[in-house]
Amino acid sequence: MLNSKGFDLWADDYDKSVGLSEEENRYPFAGYKRILGDIYKIIMEKPNVVVLDLGFGTGTLTTRLYENGCTIYGQDFSSRMIELACEKMPGAHLYQGDFSRGLAEELKQVSFDFIIATYSIHHLTDEQKTVLLKDLLAHLKAGGKILIGDVAFSNRKALDQCKKEYADEWDNDEIYCVADELRTEFPNLIFEKKTFCSGILILAGENFVLYETIGLEGK
């Protein structure tokens, strides 16, 4: 697993690394652009929203949201990633911190229409994911949603099948979301499968009005 300095070193080449895997439709980034595009469409259905991005990296998705009028908050534990993102989004509120330990102090008093995490939450253990998601639900505005785009699977069998197929490339330091298992703690969780190894997980806050899902292939 990369630490904060490891991500600093990777930052300049991150987008290129993602692109190679995505174009070849291979684990781990198969469907990457589609997932970011679908999350973007969901958010842009609602005007003047406040968005928190956890693990925003170089700001690939949040930059598009920022340019289209969203108020952007973010937390990342790489100072270099923050530096790159600030160049693209000078008016965004970006903070350094390890979100496996919770939100940065500056974010704890803010409520959000959307909280997003794209290809970042897999660095947390299952227990840390549960604690974080419960905390994040408390920071949603009425009708708000958590959107997680990542390497993810509908069930353990699908994960094991992917792990077997990509045994030489599998990252054992990363802990991927399994929708069926997360529903033990979050029974209303929705999983939109996008590829054999990726999808979007959706958790809603109180007074949630369900948006029409985009490209739903399976739960």
What are the residue ranges of the model-derived segments?
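An acidic, carboxylate-rich microenvironment
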Residues: Q128-V131, E181
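A conserved beta-strand element that flanks and buttresses the S-adenosyl-L-methionine
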Residues: I116
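Class I (Rossmann-like) S-adenosyl-L-methionine-dependent methyltransferase catalytic domain
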Residues: M1-I43, T58-E106, L147-K219
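Short catalytic micro-motifs in class I SAM-dependent methyltransferases
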Residues: Y119-S120
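Conserved class I S-adenosyl-L-methionine
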Residues: N48-G55
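A short glycine-rich, Lys/Arg-flanked "PGG" loop and its adjoining helix->strand segment in the class I
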Residues: T130-A142
